[in-house]
């Protein structure tokens, strides 16, 4: 058997997401994929422990939520046994019952349901789309979000939700790009301005809504792109928002790369030739140092390290980029994650804002190469 065939088989074992990642060309990830698969499974086992405690709302300024949607998305992408175990249904039911009230919640729920079964959960995804469209700020960003009037969704009639395969549970064909999409009309807006963290997740969620068959207003993409272009710093990077006097840092810049590419894709513009994207590539290549994510408002200390690792994955996957400068992001990140997984299957940063459940979810999303690349059509 050829080396390419063996590599393709190994990637297939991680699931459809990993296999899609290596389309052109089939790049050697440079890590032991059997060890990666085992680490993913151990991480999934960890986040399924003690769910009664994990799913309780926590008091965090601006959030007021729990981690159910992030756990759900990580389990969907982990695939295999992760989506057939009873804990998966517990997390799914919990996430579906909660009223949409926050940007992160709506965005990640849309991502999870679109990856799991967009036909069965179309009504829920449509509500996520409406919530996100109605919460876009005047300047094109998103803030934490607030409740909007939404109908009570239900499962699609005549369809059954059954577990899918690894790396995304793709149990129905994605024909959203070849059939008429259901338009989402903007009915309101958020505050005057938001931040680049909520904004990058809102755009990821809206991308999933589009892929599930819902047409996001053209102006939503236009304003979203304008917000990123107008807040890019001279060094090519981004920080959290205009209010904080701090320099660019990796996680916001990686989020910016993916966000600009998403917006330009739906605006039918060539993101590959974008000066905004290429300047950001330069910043990441110059400052690539996994897992360090020095944040100015935290005194330059590395913070939100696993949030940062998942942002690397999205920047690389969305733009079909295997390296930033000389840095092969998947090899470097996967090796670091394999070295730093704890005995109980979890990951947790020792730096500020470490959290075992969140950090483990972000690690799983990185290792599974969870993000579907944007297919550039030459427009």
Question: Regions from the language model: what does each represent?
Answer:
Residues 17-21:
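Sec/Tat signal peptide C-region and signal peptidase I cleavage site
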Residues 22-42, 53-87, 98-130, 137-222, ...:
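An alpha-helical repeat/solenoid feature that recognizes helix-turn-helix modules
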Residues 1-4:
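Positively charged n-region of N-terminal signal peptides that target proteins for export
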Residues 8-16:
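Bacterial N-terminal signal peptides
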């Amino acid at each position: 058997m050829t080396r390419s065939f063996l590599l393709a088989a190994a990637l297939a074992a991680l699931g459809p997401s990993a296999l899609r990642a290596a389309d052109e060309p089939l790049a050697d990830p440079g890590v032991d994929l059997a060890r990666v698969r085992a680490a993913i499974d151990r991480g999934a086992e960890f986040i399924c422990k003690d769910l009664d405690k994990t799913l309780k709302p926590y008091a965090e300024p601006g959030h007021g939520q729990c981690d159910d949607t992030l756990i759900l998305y990580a389990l969907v992408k982990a695939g295999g046994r992760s989506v057939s175990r009873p804990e998966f249904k517990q997390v799914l039911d919990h996430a579906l019952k909660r009223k949409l009230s926050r940007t992160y919640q709506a965005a990640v729920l849309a991502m999870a349901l679109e990856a799991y079964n967009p036909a069965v959960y179309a009504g829920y995804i449509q509500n996520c789309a409406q919530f996100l469209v109605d919460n876009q700020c005047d300047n094109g960003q998103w803030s934490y979000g607030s409740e909007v009037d939404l109908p009570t969704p239900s499962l699609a009639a005549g369809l059954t939700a059954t577990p899918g395969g690894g790396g995304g549970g793709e149990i129905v064909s994605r024909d959203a790009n070849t059939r008429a999409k259901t338009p989402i009309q903007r009915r309101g807006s958020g505050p005057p301005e938001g931040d680049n963290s909520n904004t990058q997740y809102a755009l990821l969620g809206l991308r999933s809504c589009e892929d599930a068959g819902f047409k996001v207003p053209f102006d939503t993409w236009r304003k979203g792109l304008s917000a990123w272009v107008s807040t890019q710093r001279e060094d090519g990077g981004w920080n959290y928002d205009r209010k904080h006097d701090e320099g660019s840092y990796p996680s916001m810049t990686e989020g910016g790369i993916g966000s600009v590419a998403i917006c330009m894709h739906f605006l039918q513009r060539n993101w590959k030739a974008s000066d905004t994207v290429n300047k950001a590539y330069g910043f990441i290549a110059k400052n690539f140092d996994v897992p360090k994510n020095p944040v100015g408002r935290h005194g330059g200390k590395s913070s939100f390290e696993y949030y940062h690792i998942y942002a690397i994955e999205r920047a690389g996957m969305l733009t079909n980029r295997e390296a930033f400068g000389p840095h092969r992001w998947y090899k470097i990140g996967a090796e670091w994650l394999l070295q730093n997984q704890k005995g109980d299957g979890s990951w947790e940063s020792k730096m500020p804002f470490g959290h075992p459940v969140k950090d483990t979810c972000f690690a799983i999303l990185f290792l599974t190469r969870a993000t579907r690349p944007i297919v550039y059509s030459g427009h």
